[in-house]
Amino acid sequence: MKFIEIQNEVIAKYRINLCDGTKCKNDWSRTHAHPQKRRVCKWKQVNSVESTFTLLHEIGHIENNNSKMRRCEEEYYATAWAIGIMKQYGIADKISEKTKALYQNYILNERDRGIRRGGANYPTKEQLTLDW
């Protein structure tokens, strides 16, 4: 199965609307999700593992939408969801080490930023470590 076929299948299965960014109130520069509207904006469909993982990560935000989560937890659960779907399709092993490091570091940086800002009872780094 090609990556574009997987992308289209997942978009249909999870009832995701795509937007070029013209419906956004904020001028976001990168791909992002609007969970209440089940919308992913500014995602470019390309037949690649990176494009597929980006889409799945944003759908992960939609599928794991919980306003009580901290940012690091939102990112962790969205990424973990994306990894799970990649595993279901048998393509998780195609995610590059660079991409893995980027997502993991982003989660841990969000955790550290929350703690620096006075947040308490944050998950440990071990609890936020992704299982690739």
Task: Enumerate the predicted regions with their spans.
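Active-site recognition of the HExxH zinc-binding catalytic motif
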Residues: T52-N66
